[in-house]
Amino acid sequence: MHDPIADMLTRIRNACMARHATVSIPSSKMKLAIAQILKREGFIQDFTVQEGKPRNTIVITLKYTPDRRPVITGLKRVSKPGLRIYTKRADIPRVRGGLGLSILSTPRGVMAGHEAWQQRVGGEVLCYVW
């Protein structure tokens, strides 16, 4: 697999469209950090890490509105292995007029765009969530 983060976003997108309750994703530190941000910002209900022999797995519990519409309506991978996208603090993008979220990989770790702006750091724009 060339882009594990894109794979994670695609699995979440497909599970939301199919109205699944949970989705399983192979674990890594970066994916765990992204899942923590999605939970903290209210886009997913919860996540757990299941220990496994060959590899640990992240099980994400998706969040839906009372009328069974997914809270996550869109996910977009921005910086890709073939074309990295970096941004300064002043240029951190707002997603959907502030209704969405940008996730950045900074020297201080993976964080949401508004957190990076508050901490005055820029970094690699991993993805947008809305």
Curated annotation (Swiss-Prot):
InterPro entries on file: Ribosomal_uS8, Ribosomal_uS8_sf
Domain of life: Bacteria
GO cellular component: ribonucleoprotein complex; ribosome
One of the record's GO molecular function terms: rRNA binding
SUPFAM superfamilies found in the cross-reference section: Ribosomal protein S8
Keyword vocabulary terms for this entry: Ribonucleoprotein, Ribosomal protein, RNA-binding, rRNA-binding
Record carries keyword Cell wall biogenesis/degradation: no
Biological-process GO terms, alphabetical: translation
Quaternary organization: Part of the 30S ribosomal subunit. Contacts proteins S5 and S12.
Annotated family: Belongs to the universal ribosomal protein uS8 family.
Role noted for this protein: One of the primary rRNA binding proteins, it binds directly to 16S rRNA central domain where it helps coordinate assembly of the platform of the 30S subunit.
Protein name from the UniProt record: Small ribosomal subunit protein uS8
Organism in which the protein naturally occurs: Roseiflexus sp. (strain RS-1)
Gene: rpsH
